[in-house]
């Protein structure tokens, strides 16, 4: 499908700009169409190079290493799948160049995959809009090893991204809104010490998991994680229903 067809069919363009003029919109391929990730998304604004998904990527693994080319491709493919859901739900997406603490993705390595780096251990997580993912999560071997070590039967790149973006949207939708009291009624008080909560969760003395109260065992560790796990599963359900509908 070429840009003229997109315009003729009246498809909605997802641009990082808040508004798009009423005149004819000319699409062009994302600049990463010609990179190793082969991004197939289009861009509506002629002044922008990258699609709304690629524009949120801040750091990628060193592409001089052949393994990292596939890692980056798989990470971005999962991120585009995430963004389709976010866009369909009309959730706000502003990247790190558009506002302070805007959405940014850092796909990082550590010494386990690149001995020349100073970072010994990269943990997947979120902080003030920045979502960090260990690039090795794109490796099947590493993924299965972590499944065994962490006791996680369901562990995917997309699952990580759904979970971490839940923390990001908590900051936007809940933290400074009238919804905070309702959040605490349902999930608990997020002001309890996060470090101590996780230390207790990973200790031998953690309480027995109660499946009638939490959607996953990790959700029981802290209200923030309860929210993020619930959010991730909601996005998973939405995607599953869309798949079912597509099959009629």
What are the language-model segments listed below?
Residues 28-31, 66-140, 151:
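Auxiliary, metal-adjacent structural segments of Zn-dependent hydrolase domains
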Residues 155-175, 228:
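Active-site recognition of the HExxH zinc-binding catalytic motif
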Residues 155-158, 181-187:
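Alpha-helical scaffolds flanking conserved acidic
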């Amino acid at each position: 499908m070429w840009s003229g067809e997109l315009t003729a069919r009246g498809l909605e363009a997802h641009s990082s700009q808040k508004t798009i003029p009423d005149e004819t919109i000319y699409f062009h391929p994302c600049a990463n169409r010609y990179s190793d990730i082969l991004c197939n998304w289009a861009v509506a604004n002629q002044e922008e190079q990258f699609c709304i998904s690629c524009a949120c990527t801040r750091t990628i693994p060193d592409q001089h290493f052949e393994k990292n080319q596939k890692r980056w491709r798989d990470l971005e493919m999962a991120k585009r799948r995430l963004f389709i859901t976010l866009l369909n739900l009309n959730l706000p997406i502003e990247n790190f160049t558009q506002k302070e603490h805007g959405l940014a993705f850092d796909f990082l390595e550590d010494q386990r995959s690149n001995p020349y780096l100073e970072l010994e251990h990269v943990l997947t997580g979120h902080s003030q809009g920045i979502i960090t993912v260990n690039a090795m999560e794109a490796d099947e071997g590493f993924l299965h090893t972590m499944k065994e070590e962490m006791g996680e039967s369901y562990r995917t790149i997309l699952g990580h991204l759904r979970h971490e973006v839940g923390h990001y949207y908590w900051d936007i939708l809940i933290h400074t809104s009238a919804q905070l009291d309702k959040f605490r009624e349902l999930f608990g008080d997020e002001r309890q010490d996060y470090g101590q909560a996780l230390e207790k969760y990973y200790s031998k003395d953690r309480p027995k998991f109660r499946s009638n109260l939490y959607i996953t065992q990790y959700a029981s560790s802290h209200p923030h994680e309860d929210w993020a796990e619930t959010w991730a599963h909601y996005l998973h359900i939405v995607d599953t229903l869309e798949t079912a509908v597509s099959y009629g």
